[in-house]
Amino acid sequence: MKIQSLHIFFTILIPDITHEERQLLDEAFIITYQKKGITHDNVSLWDQDHPGKYKEMPILGDLYQVLLEKEETRRMANILNRLVNGSSSNFNHQTNIDSDNKYMILDISEMQSDLGLATFTALDFVWSKAKEDRTKEKAIFIDECWALLSTNELTANYILEIFKTIRGYGGAAVCASQDLEDFFSLKGGKYGKGVLNNTKTKIILNLEHKEAEVVKKELDLSEAEMLAITRFERGNALISTNNNNLLVEFKASRLEKDLITTDRKDLKELKERLEKYGETAYEKGGMAK
């Protein structure tokens, strides 16, 4: 399963990777794991010298050394070098996340040049955790989903598979996207439509006319509903669920607005309240405007 995720990782890293290179890469993955004593046998994952613990997993630097050994894989090694020895070498480390923590923050805000790789890596970790225990309720939120959905077919299929199967793991998936053109760009919109078809509830905010027409077609909206979408104010939306459409207005409580606002004036006002009232500042005021 990990090797499948690695293949997706490399299609994002090397968009023009060839079928031959993918085959050579697959062989390199297997060799890299074998060097750590790990084979297709799940038992090989366990460290015999430390019962109950896994063996040390290979990192990108280990794969890099294997790729350097053959002329035909040298191009991939050269591209990978930036993630091993260059400016993005933070990818070249063992995972050090304590998954027993109540809260985990996977901060990728400083990885703008490798945002696609970082987003996929974080999502792959979260999806793996979500599948560990079917008895626990969970939800995965994928913001700006178009960025992965429009990358390539392997990545798009990975996203679609989450939406198709997460209910079987006791969970739910939510995606948010502002760029609908890219959301439906791959293979004639095959994957974007697939996500929509596996999503029970859709919430549509204000859209430009061109994008509203796309939504009208995909959700079979009326002309009046499409026109309303183009005229929505902040807080207005159309909810589509179970073949029923409803125009709504969302009103945040003061606390909700304080926690999510990015408006400069709101943040300044919140800062002043915090300085005056401390943590009780969040309790001041009623419904947000």
Question: Which residues does each predicted region cover?
Answer:
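P-loop NTPase motor domains
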Residues: M1-G171, K187, A228, F232, ...
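H-loop/switch region of ABC-family ATPase nucleotide-binding domains
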Residues: S177
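Aromatic-lined carbohydrate-recognition surfaces of secreted/lumenal glycan-active proteins
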Residues: L180
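C-terminal regions of RecA-like/P-loop NTPase motor modules
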Residues: F183-K289
